[in-house]
From Swiss-Prot:
A motif (Q motif) lies at residues 38-66. This is Eukaryotic initiation factor 4A-III. Expressed in the CA1 field and dentate gyrus of the hippocampus (at protein level). It is found in: Nucleus; Nucleus speckle; Cytoplasm. It comes from the Eukaryota. A motif (DEAD box) lies at residues 187-190. It comes from Rattus norvegicus (Rat). GO terms for biological process: associative learning; cellular response to brain-derived neurotrophic factor stimulus; cellular response to selenite ion; embryonic cranial skeleton morphogenesis; exploration behavior; mRNA splicing, via spliceosome; mRNA transport; negative regulation of excitatory postsynaptic potential. The modification N-acetylmethionine is found at residue 1. The modification Phosphothreonine is found at residue 163.
Length: 411
């Protein structure tokens, strides 16, 4: 892409041009010593990596890449905050690939992600960018065969991307050897360091060599996370976007007032034709609700697919494959989908339930406007949700209007 290099999956999306001025509006609250490197050619990257970057379809680094890649390559600990769809994944992937010694068939970089799908996507992106480097990269995730993990790790992997539980398990079994690890990347750190993953990350961290470089990347960095970074980062460089900038421009946000829960379903059915203009994701807060809504939609003869964390890994993979290819157009999901999964053609998000915490809101709707294309987010709001909606508006300094009749024209 000309203005932003974002880890996309379809060729056309990669080539999509963003206007130059779109990037200049992004304000960074950044450590003073961070300079801007405007092209990939001037970053001092190895030749075979540059080939991979251009072959992937990237042309010009995005704002976060212009600032972060050079610092990571220098060996600095980095806290990078950037909006969804601005190329965060490519930022650390390019940096990791640059720092590898390909002759040494040992794990030199470890990337932790909160979901299996995100870990697999990171692995695929690394293999694509490192296509000319002969890089070995394995996704170490729960729900897959442990024996296969052990076999792959014994063969030797330069980079391991994975979920904290399985990665720690592999370290404990001594299948994943940590002695050569130079860099730890925490992707979607706000989610990772939330209660569920905090302990596991510390467990993994204790096994790493003392001089390991730490890179932490996320869309939102609440205060308590910045406090935690003090524990395992040394004099980190900060590359931060002002929070006001965090709701993506180009995403129109609306609400539909529904007096009670039962009315949400009728509203969704009325909107179905609008949903299928491109592709849509519908978010519910619980797995049970996802299953219930999927069944109810199918009973009413609407075609939908669904995904949540309790489904077997294989099933989730095939659902994602269908959705990416466009074979399925409407996906009902829990927040497992909200983090970092690129499907360029999604331009409509529906919050059937408002998210349980306001941090999640940006992860959900930050999907629909990726690559600078316009997107629409529609929030179903019961009477007792009005307070939550106002809180979200205030938190992100944004405005959420009542949905107009002609919403289909906006997609």
């Amino acid at each position: 892409m000309a203005a932003t290099a974002t880890m996309a999956t379809s060729g056309s999306a990669r080539k999509r041009l963003l206007k130059e001025e779109d990037m200049t509006k992004v304000e960074f609250e950044t450590s003073e010593e961070v300079d801007v490197t405007p092209t990939f050619d001037t970053m001092g990257l190895r030749e075979d990596l540059l080939r991979g970057i251009y072959a992937y379809g990237f042309e010009k680094p995005s704002a976060i890449q212009q600032r972060a890649i050079k610092q990571i390559i220098k060996g600095r600990d980095v806290i990078a905050q950037s909006q969804s769809g601005t190329g965060k994944t490519a930022t650390f992937s390019i940096s990791v690939l640059q720092c590898l010694d390909i002759q040494v068939r040992e794990t030199q970089a470890l990337i932790l992600a909160p979901t299996r799908e995100l870990a697999v996507q990171i692995q695929k992106g690394l293999l694509a960018l490192g296509d000319y480097m002969n890089v070995q990269c394995h996704a170490c995730i729960g729900g897959t065969n442990v024996g296969e993990d052990i076999r792959k790790l014994d063969y030797g992997q330069h980079v391991v991307a994975g979920t904290p539980g399985r990665v720690f398990d592999m370290i404990r079994r001594r299948s994943l050897r940590t002695r050569a690890i130079k860099m730890l990347v925490l992707d979607e750190a706000d989610e990772m360091l939330n209660k569920g993953f905090k302990e596991q990350i510390y467990d993994v961290y204790r096994y790493l060599p003392p001089a390991t470089q730490v890179v932490l990347i996320s869309a939102t960095l609440p205060h308590e996370i910045l406090e935690m970074t003090n524990k395992f980062m040394t004099d980190p460089i900060r590359i931060l976007v002002k929070r006001d900038e965090l709701t993506l421009e180009g995403i129109k946000q609306f609400f539909v007032a529904v007096e009670r829960e039962e009315w949400k379903f009728d509203t969704l059915c009325d909107l179905y034709d609008t949903l299928t203009i491109t592709q849509a994701v519908i978010f519910c807060n619980t797995k049970r609700k996802v299953d219930w809504l999927t069944e109810k939609m199918r009973e009413a003869n609407f075609t939908v697919s669904s995904m949540h964390g309790d489904m077997p890994q294989k099933e989730r993979e095939s659902i994602m494959k269908e959705f990416r290819s466009g074979a399925s157009r409407v996906l009902i999901s829990t927040d497992v989908w909200a983090r970092g999964l690129d499907v360029p053609q999604v331009s409509l998000i529906i919050n059937y339930d408002l998210p349980n915490n306001r941090e999640l809101y940006i992860h959900r709707i930050g999907r629909s406007g990726r690559y600078g294309r316009k997107g629409v987010a529609i929030n179903f709001v019961k009477n007792d949700d009005i307070r939550i909606l106002r809180d979200i508006e205030q938190y992100y300094s944004t405005q959420i209007d009542e949905m107009p009749m002609n919403v289909a024209d906006l997609i």
